[in-house]
Design a protein with these regions (language model features):
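Juxtamembrane and boundary regions of transmembrane helices in multi-pass small-molecule transporters
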Residues: 1-5, 11-22, 26-84, 92, ...
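Small-residue-rich segments of transmembrane alpha-helices in multi-pass membrane proteins
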Residues: 6-8, 77-82, 145-160, 213-223, ...
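Short helix-coil transition sites and intra-membrane helix breaks within transmembrane domains
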Residues: 9-19, 114, 159-166, 197-210, ...
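Helical membrane-embedded segments and adjacent short helical loop/helix-boundary regions
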Residues: 44-48, 84-93, 113-118, 138-154, ...
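Flexible hinge motifs at transmembrane-helix junctions and intramembrane kinks/re-entrant loops
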Residues: 57-61, 86-91, 99-141
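Hydrophobic alpha-helical transmembrane segments in multi-pass integral membrane proteins
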Residues: 100-103, 153-171, 223, 227, ...
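Core transmembrane alpha-helical segments of multi-pass membrane transporters/permeases
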Residues: 136-170, 181-196, 200
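Hydrophobic alpha-helical transmembrane segments of multi-pass integral membrane proteins
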Residues: 179-222, 226, 233-234
Length: 295
């Protein structure tokens, strides 16, 4: 359940998962849908919250844990006692984090504030306050991998957009692809495929970079609602990783603890991925209609 919850919360906010930025870049360039941090949260937080209610309950029923009763209060009190009072560095980090969230949300109410600038200022404060040292930054290889690869992929995406590659591909598919079904059915089919195909990918970034532009282009060529389709794929990008224990980076770490066998994990993952997919449409479409994002 710990892993399953992380895959749901990963799509609820733009900053919840690093590949979300890349996914939004593709969605914006191919469908025209662009969102601020607050708009993303408004659109996807409610479907995510509903999933957070049902997914752990179903997961508990599918793979019941050996320990069903624990003294939460005592464990929390013991853990808090071990941590001790908040250090000054932790207080500074908490304030910086809250201010960064506010900064990312401000553009949605008319403030001309770059999310990148907010992130850089927050990182600079954290660095000069000594919360993160240069050695910490150098030794965190995953961060540098993300920085380099995301920069390269975003640059390639921009170049393809300027060359009108995605527009050409959409026009070509529209002229040669015959899908005699309604646009909503196309969204259902493509989003389901986007979840199933995650069995072939051990990285959200790899999936987004290689498959998301294809799904987006096929969908646009079929006349789908760009806003609905973009929102759906932004969500399936994350919870599609439910299907396997290697669908995202936390999976192998949690699986290696030895609490679950492969059969139970994959069974629970498949069932919960389907449940999440259903809840996305059952909750998402009425919610997006209510807030005026789709007609």
């Amino acid at each position: 359940n710990g892993y399953f919850v992380t895959k749901i919360t990963s799509f609820m906010f733009l900053t919840a998962m690093a590949p979300n930025v890349l996914a939004l870049d593709f969605v914006t360039k191919i469908t025209g849908l662009n969102m601020t941090w607050a708009e993303w949260a408004l659109a996807l937080a409610l479907p995510g919250l509903v999933m957070l209610i049902f997914v752990p309950l179903v997961g508990y029923w599918i793979d019941r844990p050996e320990a069903v009763k624990i003294d939460n209060k005592k464990l929390a009190a013991d853990g808090l006692a071990k941590l001790g009072p908040m250090k000054m560095s932790e207080k500074i980090l908490a304030v910086v984090f809250i201010l960064a969230l506010i900064g990312w949300a401000l553009p949605s109410i008319g403030f001309d504030l770059s999310p990148t600038a907010v992130a850089l200022v927050a990182m600079t404060i954290v660095f000069f306050a000594g919360i993160i040292t240069w050695d910490d930054m150098v030794q965190t290889k995953a961060v540098w991998n993300t920085f380099i690869w995301f920069g390269a992929i975003l640059g390639l995406s921009t170049a393809l957009t300027k060359a009108k590659f995605f527009a050409w591909l959409a026009a070509y598919m529209q002229a040669n692809l015959a899908l005699d079904v309604s646009p909503l059915v196309v969204v259902l089919i493509l989003s389901a495929i986007s979840v199933v195909i995650r069995y072939l990918f051990a990285s959200s970034t790899a999936y987004i970079a290689s498959m998301l532009p294809v799904f987006l282009t096929v969908g646009m060529a079929s006349g789908v609602d760009p806003v609905m389709f973009g929102l759906v794929l932004l969500a399936t990008n994350a919870f599609g990783g439910l299907v396997t224990h290697y669908g995202a980076s936390p999976g192998p770490i949690i699986y290696s603890a030895g609490y679950n066998n492969l059969k139970d994990w994959w069974t629970a993952g498949a069932i919960l991925a389907v449940l999440s997919w259903v809840l996305l449409f059952v909750v998402g479409i009425p919610w997006w209609t209510f807030i005026g994002m789709i007609g």
